[in-house]
Curated annotation (Swiss-Prot):
SUPFAM superfamilies: ATP synthase (F1-ATPase), gamma subunit. This is ATP synthase gamma chain. F-type ATPases have 2 components, CF(1) - the catalytic core - and CF(0) - the membrane proton channel. CF(1) has five subunits: alpha(3), beta(3), gamma(1), delta(1), epsilon(1). CF(0) has three main subunits: a, b and c. GO terms for molecular function: ATP binding; proton-transporting ATP synthase activity, rotational mechanism. It comes from Rickettsia bellii (strain RML369-C). Produces ATP from ADP in the presence of a proton gradient across the membrane. The gamma chain is believed to be important in regulating ATPase activity and the flow of protons through the CF(0) complex. InterPro entries: ATP_synth_F1_ATPase_gsu, ATP_synth_F1_gsu. GO terms for biological process: proton motive force-driven plasma membrane ATP synthesis. Belongs to the ATPase gamma chain family. Its main location: membrane. The gene is atpG. It holds the Pfam family ATP-synt. Keywords: ATP synthesis, Cell inner membrane, Cell membrane, CF(1), Hydrogen ion transport, Ion transport, Membrane, Transport.
Length: 288
Protein backbone atom coordinates (compact mmCIF):
# COMPACT_ATOMS: atom_id res chain seq x y z
CA UNK A 1 0.00 0.00 0.00
CA UNK A 2 2.89 2.35 0.71
CA UNK A 3 3.98 1.92 -2.92
CA UNK A 4 0.50 3.00 -4.11
CA UNK A 5 0.63 6.06 -1.87
CA UNK A 6 4.03 7.04 -3.26
CA UNK A 7 2.76 6.69 -6.83
CA UNK A 8 -0.34 8.81 -6.12
CA UNK A 9 1.84 11.47 -4.47
CA UNK A 10 4.18 11.53 -7.44
CA UNK A 11 1.30 11.75 -9.93
CA UNK A 12 -0.14 14.67 -7.97
CA UNK A 13 3.26 16.39 -7.95
CA UNK A 14 3.79 15.97 -11.70
CA UNK A 15 0.26 17.24 -12.43
CA UNK A 16 1.00 20.32 -10.34
CA UNK A 17 4.21 20.92 -12.29
CA UNK A 18 2.33 20.40 -15.55
CA UNK A 19 -0.14 23.14 -14.63
CA UNK A 20 2.74 25.54 -13.95
CA UNK A 21 4.55 24.79 -17.22
CA UNK A 22 1.29 25.11 -19.17
CA UNK A 23 0.58 28.48 -17.55
CA UNK A 24 4.11 29.68 -18.34
CA UNK A 25 3.68 28.52 -21.93
CA UNK A 26 0.46 30.54 -22.30
CA UNK A 27 2.01 33.64 -20.70
CA UNK A 28 5.01 33.48 -23.04
CA UNK A 29 2.70 33.00 -26.04
CA UNK A 30 0.75 36.10 -25.05
CA UNK A 31 3.91 38.17 -24.57
CA UNK A 32 5.34 36.93 -27.85
CA UNK A 33 2.27 38.10 -29.77
CA UNK A 34 2.65 41.62 -28.35
CA UNK A 35 6.38 41.76 -29.07
CA UNK A 36 5.90 40.54 -32.65
CA UNK A 37 3.53 43.46 -33.19
CA UNK A 38 6.15 45.85 -31.80
CA UNK A 39 8.79 44.35 -34.10
CA UNK A 40 6.51 44.80 -37.12
CA UNK A 41 6.09 48.50 -36.30
CA UNK A 42 9.78 49.06 -35.49
CA UNK A 43 11.09 47.43 -38.68
CA UNK A 44 9.80 50.33 -40.79
CA UNK A 45 11.50 52.81 -38.45
CA UNK A 46 14.85 50.97 -38.57
CA UNK A 47 14.75 50.75 -42.36
CA UNK A 48 13.83 54.43 -42.70
CA UNK A 49 16.68 55.58 -40.44
CA UNK A 50 19.18 53.32 -42.21
CA UNK A 51 18.08 54.61 -45.62
CA UNK A 52 18.29 58.22 -44.46
CA UNK A 53 21.75 57.64 -43.00
CA UNK A 54 22.92 55.99 -46.22
CA UNK A 55 21.51 58.82 -48.35
CA UNK A 56 23.14 61.60 -46.33
CA UNK A 57 26.50 59.84 -46.09
CA UNK A 58 26.47 58.95 -49.78
CA UNK A 59 25.77 62.56 -50.75
CA UNK A 60 28.85 63.68 -48.80
CA UNK A 61 27.79 67.35 -48.90
CA UNK A 62 28.06 68.02 -45.18
CA UNK A 63 31.09 68.77 -43.05
CA UNK A 64 31.17 66.32 -40.17
CA UNK A 65 31.43 68.01 -36.75
CA UNK A 66 34.27 66.81 -34.51
CA UNK A 67 31.90 64.99 -32.14
CA UNK A 68 30.22 63.17 -35.04
CA UNK A 69 33.55 62.14 -36.55
CA UNK A 70 34.20 59.97 -33.48
CA UNK A 71 31.41 57.62 -34.61
CA UNK A 72 33.20 56.99 -37.90
CA UNK A 73 36.60 56.52 -36.26
CA UNK A 74 38.35 53.29 -37.24
CA UNK A 75 41.32 53.61 -34.89
CA UNK A 76 42.38 50.23 -33.54
CA UNK A 77 43.99 51.45 -30.31
CA UNK A 78 40.61 52.00 -28.63
CA UNK A 79 38.60 49.41 -26.73
CA UNK A 80 36.19 46.96 -28.35
CA UNK A 81 32.71 47.49 -26.88
CA UNK A 82 30.63 44.31 -26.63
CA UNK A 83 26.96 44.72 -25.74
CA UNK A 84 25.63 41.39 -24.47
CA UNK A 85 21.86 40.86 -24.39
CA UNK A 86 20.56 37.95 -22.32
CA UNK A 87 17.52 37.41 -20.06
CA UNK A 88 16.58 37.95 -16.43
CA UNK A 89 15.12 34.47 -16.01
CA UNK A 90 15.96 30.96 -17.12
CA UNK A 91 13.69 28.14 -18.34
CA UNK A 92 14.21 29.23 -21.95
CA UNK A 93 16.27 26.43 -23.45
CA UNK A 94 19.66 27.33 -24.93
CA UNK A 95 18.69 30.99 -25.36
CA UNK A 96 21.34 32.39 -22.99
CA UNK A 97 23.90 29.63 -23.50
CA UNK A 98 24.51 30.40 -27.18
CA UNK A 99 25.05 34.12 -26.54
CA UNK A 100 27.37 33.58 -23.57
CA UNK A 101 29.36 30.92 -25.43
CA UNK A 102 29.96 33.26 -28.39
CA UNK A 103 30.88 36.22 -26.16
CA UNK A 104 33.39 34.14 -24.21
CA UNK A 105 34.95 32.91 -27.44
CA UNK A 106 35.26 36.44 -28.85
CA UNK A 107 36.62 37.89 -25.60
CA UNK A 108 39.32 35.22 -25.48
CA UNK A 109 40.22 35.95 -29.11
CA UNK A 110 40.51 39.68 -28.41
CA UNK A 111 42.57 38.97 -25.28
CA UNK A 112 44.99 36.82 -27.26
CA UNK A 113 45.51 39.75 -29.65
CA UNK A 114 46.18 42.11 -26.75
CA UNK A 115 43.16 44.29 -27.57
CA UNK A 116 41.17 46.34 -25.06
CA UNK A 117 37.68 45.15 -24.13
CA UNK A 118 34.62 46.71 -22.51
CA UNK A 119 31.40 44.84 -21.77
CA UNK A 120 27.89 46.20 -21.35
CA UNK A 121 25.70 43.36 -20.09
CA UNK A 122 21.90 43.37 -20.25
CA UNK A 123 20.10 40.68 -18.29
CA UNK A 124 20.83 38.88 -15.02
CA UNK A 125 21.78 35.57 -16.66
CA UNK A 126 24.52 37.14 -18.73
CA UNK A 127 25.89 39.05 -15.76
CA UNK A 128 25.99 35.93 -13.58
CA UNK A 129 27.82 33.97 -16.29
CA UNK A 130 30.36 36.67 -17.20
CA UNK A 131 30.99 38.42 -13.88
CA UNK A 132 33.50 35.94 -12.49
CA UNK A 133 35.75 35.40 -15.55
CA UNK A 134 35.53 38.95 -16.97
CA UNK A 135 34.68 41.27 -14.07
CA UNK A 136 37.50 43.70 -14.95
CA UNK A 137 36.03 44.17 -18.45
CA UNK A 138 32.46 44.92 -17.34
CA UNK A 139 31.68 48.61 -17.78
CA UNK A 140 27.93 48.52 -17.11
CA UNK A 141 25.15 46.12 -16.21
CA UNK A 142 21.44 46.72 -16.84
CA UNK A 143 18.56 44.67 -15.51
CA UNK A 144 15.79 43.88 -17.96
CA UNK A 145 12.34 45.25 -17.04
CA UNK A 146 9.37 42.89 -17.28
CA UNK A 147 8.19 44.55 -20.48
CA UNK A 148 10.00 46.30 -23.33
CA UNK A 149 10.97 49.71 -21.98
CA UNK A 150 12.28 52.67 -23.97
CA UNK A 151 14.06 53.97 -20.86
CA UNK A 152 16.43 51.00 -21.01
CA UNK A 153 17.14 51.72 -24.67
CA UNK A 154 17.94 55.37 -23.84
CA UNK A 155 20.23 54.39 -20.95
CA UNK A 156 22.21 52.01 -23.18
CA UNK A 157 22.40 54.61 -25.95
CA UNK A 158 23.63 57.30 -23.57
CA UNK A 159 26.30 54.94 -22.26
CA UNK A 160 27.51 54.15 -25.79
CA UNK A 161 27.50 57.82 -26.80
CA UNK A 162 29.51 58.75 -23.70
CA UNK A 163 32.12 56.04 -24.28
CA UNK A 164 32.55 57.11 -27.91
CA UNK A 165 32.61 60.83 -27.03
CA UNK A 166 35.36 60.18 -24.46
CA UNK A 167 37.33 58.25 -27.10
CA UNK A 168 37.26 55.10 -24.95
CA UNK A 169 35.90 52.81 -27.68
CA UNK A 170 36.20 52.76 -31.46
CA UNK A 171 33.81 49.94 -32.33
CA UNK A 172 30.65 48.46 -30.88
CA UNK A 173 29.11 45.03 -31.46
CA UNK A 174 25.72 43.87 -30.15
CA UNK A 175 25.19 40.20 -29.26
CA UNK A 176 21.55 39.13 -29.33
CA UNK A 177 19.22 36.38 -30.51
CA UNK A 178 17.41 37.15 -33.77
CA UNK A 179 13.82 35.90 -33.81
CA UNK A 180 12.67 33.69 -36.70
CA UNK A 181 9.78 31.80 -35.14
CA UNK A 182 8.82 30.32 -31.78
CA UNK A 183 11.06 27.30 -32.37
CA UNK A 184 13.97 28.99 -34.13
CA UNK A 185 16.23 31.80 -32.93
CA UNK A 186 19.67 32.56 -34.30
CA UNK A 187 22.56 33.93 -32.27
CA UNK A 188 23.56 37.21 -33.92
CA UNK A 189 26.44 39.61 -33.46
CA UNK A 190 25.96 42.89 -35.24
CA UNK A 191 28.54 45.66 -35.45
CA UNK A 192 26.93 49.09 -35.25
CA UNK A 193 30.08 51.23 -34.82
CA UNK A 194 32.11 52.59 -36.47
CA UNK A 195 29.54 53.76 -39.01
CA UNK A 196 30.67 53.17 -42.57
CA UNK A 197 30.91 56.26 -44.78
CA UNK A 198 29.77 55.90 -48.36
CA UNK A 199 30.31 58.14 -51.36
CA UNK A 200 27.94 58.08 -54.30
CA UNK A 201 27.39 61.21 -56.43
CA UNK A 202 24.05 59.85 -57.62
CA UNK A 203 22.67 60.38 -54.11
CA UNK A 204 23.42 64.12 -53.93
CA UNK A 205 20.11 65.22 -55.47
CA UNK A 206 18.20 63.08 -52.97
CA UNK A 207 19.77 64.83 -49.96
CA UNK A 208 17.31 67.66 -49.36
CA UNK A 209 16.85 68.27 -45.63
CA UNK A 210 15.99 71.37 -43.61
CA UNK A 211 18.43 70.66 -40.76
CA UNK A 212 21.78 72.39 -40.75
CA UNK A 213 24.57 69.96 -41.63
CA UNK A 214 26.06 69.54 -38.15
CA UNK A 215 22.67 69.14 -36.48
CA UNK A 216 21.52 66.71 -39.13
CA UNK A 217 24.51 64.40 -38.80
CA UNK A 218 24.43 64.42 -34.98
CA UNK A 219 20.69 63.80 -34.86
CA UNK A 220 20.96 61.03 -37.41
CA UNK A 221 23.66 59.33 -35.36
CA UNK A 222 21.41 59.49 -32.28
CA UNK A 223 18.48 58.05 -34.20
CA UNK A 224 20.66 55.38 -35.79
CA UNK A 225 22.11 54.13 -32.48
CA UNK A 226 18.63 54.26 -30.90
CA UNK A 227 17.09 52.24 -33.70
CA UNK A 228 19.81 49.57 -33.64
CA UNK A 229 19.55 49.08 -29.86
CA UNK A 230 15.74 49.03 -29.95
CA UNK A 231 15.79 46.49 -32.79
CA UNK A 232 18.20 44.19 -30.94
CA UNK A 233 16.23 44.46 -27.67
CA UNK A 234 12.95 43.58 -29.38
CA UNK A 235 14.47 40.70 -31.34
CA UNK A 236 16.09 39.36 -28.17
CA UNK A 237 12.88 39.69 -26.16
CA UNK A 238 10.86 37.88 -28.84
CA UNK A 239 13.50 35.14 -29.01
CA UNK A 240 13.42 34.73 -25.23
CA UNK A 241 9.64 34.36 -25.09
CA UNK A 242 9.61 32.07 -28.13
CA UNK A 243 12.32 29.89 -26.62
CA UNK A 244 10.56 29.80 -23.25
CA UNK A 245 7.21 28.99 -24.85
CA UNK A 246 8.76 26.07 -26.73
CA UNK A 247 10.64 24.85 -23.64
CA UNK A 248 7.48 24.98 -21.50
CA UNK A 249 5.45 23.22 -24.21
CA UNK A 250 8.02 20.41 -24.27
CA UNK A 251 7.99 20.28 -20.46
CA UNK A 252 4.18 20.08 -20.44
CA UNK A 253 4.21 17.25 -22.99
CA UNK A 254 6.90 15.39 -21.03
CA UNK A 255 4.85 15.77 -17.86
CA UNK A 256 1.84 14.30 -19.69
CA UNK A 257 3.92 11.27 -20.74
CA UNK A 258 5.25 10.78 -17.21
CA UNK A 259 1.73 10.96 -15.76
CA UNK A 260 0.49 8.31 -18.22
CA UNK A 261 3.35 5.99 -17.28
CA UNK A 262 2.79 6.53 -13.55
CA UNK A 263 -0.97 5.95 -13.87
CA UNK A 264 -0.28 2.72 -15.78
CA UNK A 265 2.16 1.64 -13.08
CA UNK A 266 -0.37 2.55 -10.38
CA UNK A 267 -3.12 0.51 -12.05
CA UNK A 268 -0.84 -2.49 -12.45
CA UNK A 269 0.19 -2.28 -8.80
CA UNK A 270 -3.45 -2.10 -7.71
CA UNK A 271 -4.33 -5.07 -9.90
CA UNK A 272 -1.43 -7.05 -8.44
CA UNK A 273 -2.62 -6.29 -4.90
CA UNK A 274 -6.21 -7.24 -5.74
CA UNK A 275 -5.07 -10.45 -7.43
CA UNK A 276 -2.93 -11.35 -4.40
CA UNK A 277 -5.85 -10.73 -2.03
CA UNK A 278 -8.20 -12.85 -4.17
CA UNK A 279 -5.69 -15.71 -4.22
CA UNK A 280 -5.40 -15.51 -0.43
CA UNK A 281 -9.20 -15.52 -0.02
CA UNK A 282 -9.62 -18.50 -2.36
CA UNK A 283 -6.80 -20.36 -0.66
CA UNK A 284 -8.36 -19.69 2.73
CA UNK A 285 -11.81 -20.88 1.65
CA UNK A 286 -10.36 -24.07 0.21
CA UNK A 287 -8.50 -24.75 3.44
CA UNK A 288 -11.78 -24.48 5.36
Amino acid sequence: MSNLKQLRTRIKSVKSTQKITKAMQLVSASKLTKIKNQIAHSNFYVEAISKMMSTVLSADIYDFPIEAQKFFNTETNKANLLIVMTSERGLCGTFNYMIIKQVKSDVETLKSKGEKIKLIIIGKKGYEALKKPYESYIDSYFELPKNHDENLMLQIKQKIMALVANLEVSNCTIYFNRFKNAMTQSMTKQQILPIEKYHDDSKIEEANYEYEGENLIQNLINLYVNSQINYALLQNRASEEGSRMTAMENATNNAHDIINKLVLKLNRSRQAIITTELIEIIAGSEAV
